[in-house]
């Protein structure tokens, strides 16, 4: 069965890996003041941080259900029968919910959605490893979710921030938490 993988850009899949493997990365919407961008498509990380340093207020939004559904439908038209979708943590974003809603709107393709419960490059590395193992035949489809859980327990991500200003400006902290 032809299988494809999907994730959102917050999971930071290596661009070279993305271009050479059966994975589609759906960009997160990035808003800086009144301008809207697609993460890593219409704005680079360097440009994003430059604009924040210059005082623009950032916020992000999960990919729209319609955009996710379009990806699922395009993969189905390419003959894909199974899709594994990795979502940034449902505790941090509505992306998981959007993946589920899109799944409910399409028939004829099996979709497994995995809530990574994390964010950042370490998740991307785990996904890349899973795809390599699956593509070489060493990882059966039925074991993908368990393999992700196994890999995710092999690392911890510690995040430090220079200032909490951007977390507040992006809506991740309330005013009381910020002060």
Q: At which residue positions do the language-model features occur?
A:
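Short coil/turn segments at beta-strand junctions that form active-site/ligand-binding loops
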Residues: 1-2, 79-82, 109
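Mixed-charge interfacial surface used for oligomerization/domain docking
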Residues: 3-4, 10-31, 35, 91, ...
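Class I S-adenosyl-L-methionine
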Residues: 36-85, 89-98, 104-105
